[in-house]
Amino acid sequence: IIQMPADVLATQEVIWNTKPDIIIETGVARGGSVLFMASLLELIGNGKVIGVDIDIRTHNRKSIENHAMSKRVSLIEGGSVDDETLGKVRELIPENSKVMVILDSDHSKDHVLSECRAYGELVTPGCYMVVADTMIAHVEKEDAPVNRSNTWYKGNEPLSALQDYL
């Protein structure tokens, strides 16, 4: 799982308290968080995780599909805000489902804002849309790792997108 430990625990609490039928996560990466959330849904006894990523590497897909929790996971490869991808996501959401969304893919402001607009309408009352890595906005350039993407500096990161969306 490539997330801050406190964020993982907070997400776990939200999932446990809201018991969503569907969790959509954009940004699969290695699949750790998708499988973590699937295991929580297994404990709850219901639900499925829809993982969306522009590039699901073959070895990561195999690892996820061979995992014991794969029965609670559907993977969609494609741009998270592309019409075709969004159509596939919608097809996997049964009618009257409680839907939670976690946005954790491309962290540039424009992309996160596009995801907020595209996926926000799928979140059902009583559930949440989580925008990951908003803490990036609080890292000063001089304190950031030298190999950090320039697109993540203040003003072009998830928190700026979230603030514009709200």
Ranges and model annotations:
Residues 2-166:
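S-adenosylmethionine/decaboxylated-SAM
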